[in-house]
UniProtKB/Swiss-Prot annotation:
Binding annotation for ADP: 12, 16, 261, 303, 402, 406
CDD domains: FGGY_EcGK_like
Electron transport recorded as keyword: no
Annotated transmembrane regions: none
Protein family (similarity comment): Belongs to the FGGY kinase family.
Residue positions binding sn-glycerol 3-phosphate: 12, 82-83, 132, 239
Protein name according to UniProt: Glycerol kinase
Pathway: Polyol metabolism; glycerol degradation via glycerol kinase pathway; sn-glycerol 3-phosphate from glycerol: step 1/1
Organism of this sequence: Thermococcus onnurineus (strain NA1)
Stored Pfam families: FGGY_C (PF02782), FGGY_N (PF00370)
Recorded GO CC terms: cytosol
GO molecular function: ATP binding; glycerol kinase activity
């Protein structure tokens, strides 16, 4: 009987399930969107039940489309939007909406904590104190949901990022992996354990926390009533770490960029924990008793800016239209768009930056905004890569995610970076990374060498822009960013 791997890829706006075979081919996909909820300006939530329903529906659809039986699934891997914070009881019932990574409700709280504990947090977690991470979200829930702290003290509350919630619903086990734990701001990435001092700073009782395991081991088995089979759930990694693994970026200095709702650039630093003032240090994965680390630059809004063109100001009907519009111009004609809708992430870390379009004239049209949006994605990526280059040598950028289908963007990215940009044959690298981690745990694949041999380039974009143009464009971008920074403080003063 042929055996396959099921990968669950739970994102910020949709839940996907993908069936892979041994050669990394995609046999079946299920994908369902779920809504985001915005109870106040700057607040972003999900209903955890809507996440679960979309994910479970996606699982059933993927199995059906792959024309296989659940008994043919050798293992399940889970990958997820990170930092998003959920609390639930032991029956699996959510006790509040999930607070999404994009949510800014704890920005002021974090500013206070940052003043006193910034260095401690950076040293232990590799993270820059920001409302983006789970710790402040969990503190907010414990402090603001009536009765939650009391229940937590009694051991009646379970906390987790989305991977933990899904694994709990699938297996009844309360676990996470090193990569997801490293994004909570409560986990010591050197000792590989929850940190007592950090728990005290954020007022988190240890009893709510999941057990932390490697990224590739059996965490539990699916409850038989769900799929009619007890399938090992044996891979778990945050979406960006999973993409790094799916890109076969196993060696120090290998870099990938995922173009999704936001852009996330990771550089493998091997067994070395490297620190940068403006980048995050994170656990890439734990595998076979060894831990690999990474430098990460998180850009909060990139693909979401294209969604805004479509759904917010309605100047495009679909994302691919941006390429056609951008190509109508020979240059950006001085128009820049800084999509700082929820502040700016790496390397700026300005919670109070806001979106800005500059350089508009009477002749500015849809094509200028479309081009400026695509160029902004590339500029924001360069901002991060430049920071990384101070610590690790970078020869090329391996790319994945929806926006990599846009050849205009990929060529502009190569031009503005002055580096090769490589798009792989299998675009589903995030889901594939989770599948690889799950498969390795049950000996479906033999090891990293076999996985490396499966990775193939589909297209390589080489830089063709002259140095003077590159320098001029990037200088304009930096000026635009300066004007966007701190804007929320100006208007709130």
């Amino acid at each position: 009987m042929d055996r396959f791997i099921l990968s669950l890829d739970e994102g910020t706006t949709s839940a996907r399930a993908i069936i892979f075979d041994r050669e990394s081919n995609v046999l079946g996909v299920g994908q369902y969107e779920f809504p985001q909820h915005y109870p106040r300006p700057g607040w972003v939530e999900h209903d955890p039940n809507e996440i679960w329903e979309a994910q479970f529906r996606a699982i059933k659809t993927a199995i059906e489309r792959a024309k296989i039986e659940p008994t043919q699934i050798a293992a399940i891997g889970v990958t997820n939007q990170r930092e998003t914070t959920i609390v639930w009881d032991k029956s699996g019932k959510p006790l509040h909406n999930a607070i999404v990574w994009q949510c800014r409700r704890t920005a002021e709280m974090v500013e206070e904590i940052k003043r006193e504990y910034s260095e401690v947090i950076k040293e232990k977690t590799g993270l820059v104190p920001d409302a983006y991470f789970s710790a402040s979200k969990l503190k907010w829930l414990l402090d603001n949901v009536p009765g939650l702290r009391e229940k937590a003290e009694k051991g009646e509350v379970l906390f987790g990022t989305v991977d933990t919630f899904l694994i709990y619903r699938l297996t009844g086990e309360h676990v996470t992996d090193y990569s997801n734990a490293s994004r909570t701001m409560l986990f010591n990435i050197k000792k590989l354990e929850w940190d007592d001092e950090l728990l005290e700073i954020f007022g988190v009782p240890e009893g709510v926390l999941p057990e932390v395991k490697e990224s590739s081991e059996i965490y539990g088995y699916t409850k038989k009533e769900l799929l009619g089979a007890e399938i090992p759930v044996s891979g778990d990694a945050g979406d960006q770490q999973a993409a790094l693994f799916g890109q076969a970026a196993f060696e120090t200095g290998m870099v990938k960029a995922t173009y999704g709702t936001g852009n996330f650039i990771l550089a493998n630093t091997g067994k070395t924990v490297r620190y940068s003032d403006n980048l995050l240090t994170t656990v890439a994965w734990g595998l076979n008793g060894k831990v690999s680390y990474a430098l990460e630059g998180s850009v909060f809004i990139t693909g979401a800016a294209v969604q805004w063109l479509r759904d917010g100001i309605k100047i495009i009907k679909s994302a691919p239209e941006t390429e056609e519009l951008a190509r109508k111009l020979q240059s950006n004609e001085g128009v820049y768009f800084v999509p700082a809708f929820v502040g700016l992430g790496a390397p700026y870390w300005d919670q109070f930056a806001r979106g800005l379009i500059i350089g508009i004239t009477r002749g500015t049209g849809r094509e200028h905004l479309a081009r400026a949006t695509l160029e902004a994605i590339a500029y924001l990526t360069r901002d991060v890569v430049e920071e990384m280059e101070r610590l690790v040598g970078i020869k090329e950028l391996r790319v994945d995610g929806g926006a990599t289908a846009n050849d205009f963007l990929m060529q502009f990215q190569a031009d503005i970076l002055n580096r090769r940009v490589v798009r792989p044959v299998v675009k589903e690298t995030t889901a594939l990374g989770a599948a690889y981690l799950a498969g390795l745990a049950v000996d479906y694949w033999e090891g990293l060498e076999e996985i490396k041999s499966l990775w193939k380039a589909e297209k390589v974009f080489g830089p063709v822009m002259d140095e003077e143009t590159r320098r001029k464009l990037y200088r304009g971008w930096k000026e635009a960013v300066k004007r966007a920074m701190g804007w929320a403080k100006v208007v709130d003063a």
